[in-house]
Amino acid sequence: MDRKKDPSNNLTERRVSKVQRPNKKKVRNQVESLSRNLERNKEGQLLQTVSKGHLEADSGHSLGREKENGELGIRSIFYDKDWNPRGTAPSHYRNIPYNPATFKRRTEVQARLGNLENIKIPK
């Protein structure tokens, strides 16, 4: 018998015969596997959509510098109406937004100026 005509030795012929006469059990398993993958992909896409929505919502609230100059204005923890109205961070410090719950003062700050009482303190 010729090698090319013998289906057991011809790889192309074997592949074609598998497609033409598929095994029912293998087909069922492949369909189930594909349906599980499709469900998993849908869940992943949903999570990606939710994460993307959170990212877009959070993009307005920066935890670091805003723009190139690092100014946050009144939202900065370094903001002071008299001394630092632009809310610029000192050099080598990261500017973050002010959170009243996190940075709440427990006591009133008392100035200890000694004999320097003539210096004006911003209120």
From Swiss-Prot:
Keywords: Cytoplasm. Residues 17-28 have a biased composition (Basic residues). It holds the Pfam family NpwBP. Residues 1-16 have a biased composition (Basic and acidic residues). Disulfide bonds: none annotated. Residues 1-42 are annotated as: Disordered. GO terms for cellular component: cytoplasm. It is found in: Cytoplasm. It comes from the Eukaryota. May interact with the nuclear pore complex. Belongs to the AIM4 family. This is Altered inheritance of mitochondria protein 4. The gene is AIM4.
